[in-house]
Swiss-Prot record:
This is Alanine--tRNA ligase. It is an enzyme of class 6 (ligase). Belongs to the class-II aminoacyl-tRNA synthetase family. It catalyses: tRNA(Ala) + L-alanine + ATP = L-alanyl-tRNA(Ala) + AMP + diphosphate. GO terms for cellular component: cytosol. Binds 1 zinc ion per subunit. Zn(2+) binds at residues 570, 574, 672, 676. Signal peptide: none annotated. It comes from Xanthomonas campestris pv. campestris (strain 8004). Its cofactor is Zn(2+).
């Protein structure tokens, strides 16, 4: 029998797409690893994610047949293969899924025929090495395989409900407990009887002999709440085939790590680490993880301590730790990127575009972790030496919290030593920290609307996009001291809920409105407006006069000036976000914001400090868009329509079926429920006041706008003028004058150091003569006025050269503090230790210190005790000399 043809991974990709394009399919680009239409999903983990809304009927596409190669990630949440990566033949964090789709067009007959044609005619797989499974009641699929394709019944395996419930089967797919579902048929490749394992459905099915290569799902039912299956009017097809495991078969190897892509990456890792054994598991881990990390960064994820960014950090640090295990102490991981681009850049041009960003982000994380890895490993070794089989959860949390060791990294290390981590203890420590954080961040001491009250209320109607005041606002709920009441009196602190309101409730970073509510006999000063249960506007304030009761009808007006300043800052954050992405790269994503009347604060993902030059460019670009005076357009549309419109959605924000889109010319388009200017020119002026780091991978810019920006510039000019006056010149001369001052300061400091050295030299000449002989050893213990630690050390060196065998203690006093230096030279070092001597002296003057046997340093408080301590040195030395 002739061996099947051999295909490269790139060829397999292009063959698949070309084949289905020839069958009338639209070729759809891979969706990002970060799902754009499902904020509840951590990562794209299958090919069907981008088509989910199509299958659910919530979205229509311009085609009914599609094919794609989808990049996927399984390293967090429900689908997490991280612990297995590197230790098994086929587990990966990142993988590619080949898929073809029918949305109410072709069904089982064509799907099965085309799958067989591609496998056996294009890729030349021997038909007698292929085996298929079908759902045990799917007679149609069984007959198609037997009669149309011609597979013997002995190689068609019926799989029943093998997971303990009706339709709970490896061969029955369902999206959820209800909704679209249906049987599937799977195609397996037989590696041969020289490999252990049995066919699917047998007791030995978990062996490696029979490998699933293609799953064809036939969505033909709508599962009802009572469990019954109702036929769908337009059945669909969803297929998935793992590229890596298919490549292993078509390249005549047994494990995925032996295919061309992985062999090239493992070879690069081998060259960087100096490890020649290409089957080394750590090299496999590094090769796998560079793909996952790089494509996550391509799709806008950066290392951080939460969410997707934390998963990325875990993967990076796992790879770095495996490099450390191989003895690598230099930076290496980011150097894998060019090889990856060579291998996958043609299939994914976005990887080529983002190559520099990827390498810089990985290098920054590599440098950061290198600082703590050594220290963290020492802590782990210490904990492991004190533990038997279990690493205590509290210690695992300390490694995570202090040294940045993700718990699965700690578990990985523990497993290699035959140990495990107490995960319950770790989760307890983690939850305790979360509770502390939640308690610190709760508004109003954790005030919440009772569930029974929420059930009786309709969502607040917000009038504030069009109006700044309104009448006929009915009081529908009233809280006093966090509890529902029917009535409140003058002086009471309350939270008032009305059916409608012009007051904006804090959300999306924008602070809530303040203002006034009033009725016939009542006036309420509103200090803030907060959103409760995501849909009710609570007016937080104090009853100034009168009494308020449920059912009262009020008029309300916001603080117009405060809102006016706030909207300038909110609109500016949109322009800033766009400018950051333009200047720094599309990896920049909003991580948080504060939009207040007096300033704006914008947190965003970026892996290094922003240079002064970059800040200047960003500021100029924002002000250019302000001067362009774009009209700010508001569009209300369906979520998918908004995404197609180009609007940016922020992960973590909750969006309804319809969303509000803010468009500022062609520069910025974002989903936003906040209040904004009518034209960008209303912002007036944008001025950055500060930039800095918030946490690893997150930067913060603060800025002011409008009159606040003008006031800021005026204050800066005033300070500049004041500085110029102090320097005796005008503002244009400040730089030259400051430079001259710093040059003069450096010159004077050098002269001062020279004078101190001369003083020390002269002092030592005199001190040598005052040495006391103790058992043949010269002992000096003196106080020197004005000597700092450096001058004391220089004096110590000269005295050692001058005296030979000696014990020397020098105390430099200045400003109520004492610097101590103790030295032991020559013969006495065997019995007299400088560290012990200095500790003895420092303890008498309220200080501390230590060092080597021949030299120690410390300090303490100046006072009478110093003289006593120095006088006692000769007797202490005599005692230790014996």
């Amino acid at each position: 029998m002739n061996a099947p043809a051999k295909f490269s991974t790139s060829q397999i990709r292009s063959d698949f797409l070309a084949f289905f394009e020839g069958k009338g399919h639209t070729i759809v680009p891979s969706a990002p690893l970060v799902p754009g239409n499902d904020p509840t999903l951590l990562f794209t983990n299958s090919g069907m994610v981008q088509f989910k809304d199509v299958f659910l009927g919530a979205e229509k596409r311009s085609y009914v047949r599609a094919a794609d190669v989808q990049r996927c990630l399984r390293a967090g949440g429900k689908h997490n293969d991280l612990d297995s990566v590197g230790y098994t033949a086929r587990h990966h964090t990142f993988f590619e899924m080949l898929g073809n789709w029918s949305f109410g067009d072709y069904f089982k007959k064509d799907a099965i025929a085309w799958a067989w044609e591609l496998l056996t005619q294009v890729w030349k797989l021997p038909a007698d090495r292929l085996l298929v499974t079908v759902y045990h009641t799917d007679e149609e699929a069984f007959e198609l395989w037997r009669d149309m394709i011609g597979i013997p019944e002995s190689r068609i395996v019926r799989i029943g409900d093998n997971k303990g419930a009706p339709y709970a089967s490896d061969n029955f797919w369902q999206m959820a407990d209800t909704g679209p579902c249906g049987p599937c048929t799977e195609i397996f490749f037989d590696h041969g009887d020289h490999i252990a394992g049995g066919p699917p459905g047998s007791p030995d099915e978990d062996g490696d002999r029979f490998i699933e290569i293609w799953n064809l799902v036939f969505m033909q039912f709508d599962r009802q709440p009572d469990g019954t299956l109702v036929p769908l009017p337009a059945p669909c097809v969803d297929t998935g085939m793992g590229l890596e495991r298919l490549a292993a078969i078509l390249q005549h190897v047994h494990t995925n790590y032996e295919i061309d892509v992985f062999q090239a990456l493992i070879g690069k890792a081998s060259a960087l680490t100096g490890i020649a054994d290409l089957e080394n598991k750590s090299l496999r881990v590094i090769a796998d993880h560079i793909r996952a990390c790089s494509f996550l960064i391509v799709d806008g994820v950066l290392p951080s301590n939460e969410g997707r960014g934390y998963v990325l950090r875990r993967i990076i640090r796992r790879a770095l730790r495996h490099g450390w295990m191989l003895g690598v102490r230099q930076l290496f991981f980011s150097k894998m990127v060019p090889t990856l681009v060579e291998l996958m850049g043609e299939a994914y041009p976005e990887l080529v575009v983002a190559q520099e960003t990827v390498a810089r982000a990985l290098l920054a994380e590599e440098e950061r972790f290198a600082e703590t890895l050594d220290a963290g490993m020492k802590i782990f070794d210490d904990v492991a030496s004190r533990s038997q089989e279990i690493i205590p959860g509290a210690d695992a949390f300390r490694l995570y919290d202090t040294y940045g060791f993700p718990v699965d990294l700690t578990a990985d290390i523990a497993r290699e030593r035959g140990m495990r981590v107490d995960m319950e203890g770790f989760e307890f420590a983690m939850e305790r920290q979360r509770e502390t954080a939640r308690a610190a961040g709760k508004f109003g001491g954790g005030v919440a609307l009772p569930a029974d009250l929420v059930a009786t209320m309709a969502p607040t109607v917000f009038l504030g996009y069009e109006a700044q005041d309104a009448d006929a606002l009915k009081v529908v709920a009233l809280l006093k001291q966090g509890r529902p009441v029917d009535r409140a009196e003058a002086g009471d602190e309350v939270i008032v809920f009305t059916d409608r309101t012009p007051f904006y409730a804090e959300s999306g970073g924008q602070v809530g409105d303040s203002g006034q509510l009033s009725g016939t006999d009542v006036s309420i000063e509103v200090a803030d407006t907060q959103k409760f249960a995501g849909q009710f506007h609570g007016h937080v304030g104090r009853i100034a006069e009168g009494a308020l009761k449920l059912g009262d009808v009020l008029s309300g007006g916001i603080d117009v000036q405060r809102r006016g300043k706030t909207i300038l800052n909110h609109s500016a954050t949109h322009l800033l976000h766009a400018a950051l992405r333009e200047v720094l790269g599309t990896h920049v994503q909003q991580k948080g914001s504060l939009v207040a009347p007096d300033r704006l604060r914008f947190d965003f993902s970026h892996f290094q400090p922003i240079t002064a030059e970059e800040l200047a460019v960003i500021e100029r670009k924002v002000n250019a868009e302000v001067r362009t005076n774009h009209s700010v357009e508001v569009h209300n549309m369906a979520m998918q329509e908004a995404l197609d419109f180009g609007a940016m959605a922020l992960f973590g924000e909750k969006y309804g079926e319809r969303v509000r889109v803010l468009k500022m010319g062609g520069y910025s388009t974002e989903l936003c429920g906040g209040t904004h200017v009518s034209r960008t020119g209303d912002i007036g002026l944008f001025k950055i006041t500060s930039e800095g780091g918030v946490s690893s991978g997150v930067r913060r810019i603060e800025a002011v706008t409008g009159q606040g920006a003008l006031d800021y510039v005026a204050e800066e000019e005033r300070r500049l003028g004041e500085a110029a006056n102090l320097l005796g010149g005008n503002s244009t001369e400040i730089v030259d004058k400051v430079r001259a001052l710093t040059d003069r300061q450096k010159r004077l400091e050098r002269e001062l150091e020279s004078l101190k050295a001369k003083l020390a030299s002269g002092a030592t000449a005199d001190l040598g003569a005052s040495a006391v002989d103790v058992a043949g050893v010269k002992v000096i213990a003196v106080r020197l006025e004005g000597f700092d630690a450096k001058a004391l050390r220089e004096a110590m060196d000269r005295l050692k050269q001058q005296l030979g065998d000696s014990v020397i203690v020098l105390a430099g006093a200045a400003g109520g503090k004492v610097a101590l230096v103790a030295g032991v030279n020559g013969g006495p070092t065997g019995k007299v230790k400088a560290g012990e001597l200095l500790g003895h002296i420092a303890s008498q003057i309220g200080g501390k210190g230590g060092g080597r046997p021949d030299l120690a340093q410390g300090g303490g408080e100046d006072g009478p005790a110093l003289a006593t301590a120095l006088q006692g040195v000769p007797s202490w030395v005599k005692q230790h000399l014996g």
